[in-house]
Amino acid sequence: MGSSDVDFFIHSYYEFKLFGVTLSINTTMVTTVIVCLILLALILFARYEIMKDYDEPNVVQNVVEMIVEKMDAMVVSNMGIHAKKYLNYVEALMAFIFLSNISGLFGLRPPTADFGTTFGLALITFVMIEYAWIKTKGFGIIKDLLDPFPVFLPINIISEFATPVSMSLRLFGNVRAGTIMLGLWYALMPWFTKIGIPAFLHAYFDFFSGAIQTYVFGMLTMVFISNRYD
């Protein structure tokens, strides 16, 4: 198999027209729905186990409580008194990104390997950042944009809009690189190298790197929002 056989494109499964515009259901949409359904199933299962009246906490309860406590502590330590407002968003965001990143372990194409997905997530965070800024400063944001001199206004505006772009590119680039590396390995290496070795590659690119990128995106979200309240 040559390099020409390697395919990294997003494929369309079904196309239809709406108001004269051609729309399609593609790979990213399908895997995003699958990830969301898995996340919902895990949440419902965890809730069901927690609500059960056991004489002693079972393994599921202990694991769920440990994860929630660690996540809560992380958000509170980074956002302080403002943590309560953003707790659900940050934890849901990180859960979705992590499941998306590790979906490659199960033969799926990670939704976060699509720039549209990562930019959408970064855009939601950007709206929250700007909302916190406006709520805190009001018209004082104009003064911030003109700081330290009015001539810096264009640069400050560009730096504001660079936030969602840089956040989305960082996540997209790392996940996309992992899918490309794994795709090249499967396509170009001899058959005997595809036994055993890919498990270690998936463990690094999908799980380890995926966990790091989830943490980085979540931390940036918390830090950027918190800074707007200072």
Show where each model-derived region lies.
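Selective transmembrane helix interface/packing segments
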Residues: M1-D230
